Regions:
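Catalytic-domain carbohydrate-binding cleft regions of carbohydrate-active enzymes
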Residues: 1-224, 232
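Accessory, solvent-exposed terminal regions and/or long lumenal/extracellular loops of proteins
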Residues: 218-257
């Protein structure tokens, strides 16, 4: 870290967990994860609870790193979760069966991956603001529900559900879809108040747990009534990116009320 500081102003160090205090310098990651649904199901809990020891900039190998088998649905669900994680990092061992780039999948999966990656770009203003709060105030970027609702039993029971920044509640789908319904599902606890689907604005009453169903190209993310989400209005498309073009943001805001 000190050597990197001498050469460059902004640096990234990626490291495994190395004991208490090791969160101060690097981005952490959860190790070489196996490509499986069981592994994905563990990652949201692992990511949010890393904040318990100060490791708020925590990442995971999106899609899994090794072993397992090629599973397009698993890869897309993991990428969706990655878009709403502190660090969005596709990674795998060198193999034609484990590659996670969108162009390695069929048209439906590829386009959905592209849409979610462009959404990640749109979220930069929101994530940047949340990261500033993390850096200046020490508030975790990702929090287990019990940080905000410590007296609610449900906050401890829904281990894969978490808060991203101050405005978004995320509930990744981590199980295979129902073959009959052709939808994935996850049980979501809605704390007190009114919550809105981040993508379509559908309202949900609070103080209730519901099984929420989503098609393979959709993901459960919610904003509480009154939330203001700053977004980039026009994320760059791949054909617009050139070595000469400077990176820019054109802001917009989503308001949930």
């Amino acid at each position: 870290y000190q050597n990197a500081q001498k050469k460059h102003k902004n640096n990234i160090i990626l490291s495994r967990y190395a004991g208490p205090g090791s969160h101060r310098y690097p981005l952490g990651f959860s190790g070489d994860s196996v490509i499986s649904w069981a592994s994905l199901d563990f990652q949201p809990y692992f990511t949010s609870t890393a904040s318990n020891i100060g490791y708020t900039w925590w990442s995971h190998d999106i899609g899994g790193h090794m072993q397992g088998y090629k599973d397009a649905e698993l890869s897309l669900r993991w990428l969706q979760f990655g878009v709403f994680s502190p660090i969005n990092r596709l990674h795998s061992s060198k193999s034609e069966f484990t590659s996670k780039e969108p162009w390695h999948f069929d048209a439906v999966i590829e386009q959905s991956m592209i849409d979610f990656l462009q959404l990640r770009h749109q979220l930069i203003p929101y994530l940047y603001s949340a990261n500033l709060i993390t850096a200046s105030e020490g508030r975790a970027l990702v929090e287990p529900l019990y940080y905000e609702y410590p007296m609610e039993e449900e906050a401890y029971q829904h281990r894969n559900q978490y808060l991203l920044g101050e405005q978004l509640m995320v509930a990744p789908i981590t199980e295979k879809m129902n073959s009959l319904l052709q939808m994935g599902s996850v049980e979501v606890w809605f704390p007190e108040g009114t919550w809105y689907d981040f993508f379509n604005g559908q309202p949900y009453d609070g103080k209730v747990s519901l099984k929420v169903y989503r098609e393979i190209t959709e993901m459960p993310v919610f904003a509480k009534a009154g939330a203001i989400i700053p977004l980039d209005k026009n994320p760059l498309k791949k054909e617009e990116i050139t070595s000469e073009r400077k990176y820019f943001l054109e802001p917009m805001v989503s308001i949930f009320y």
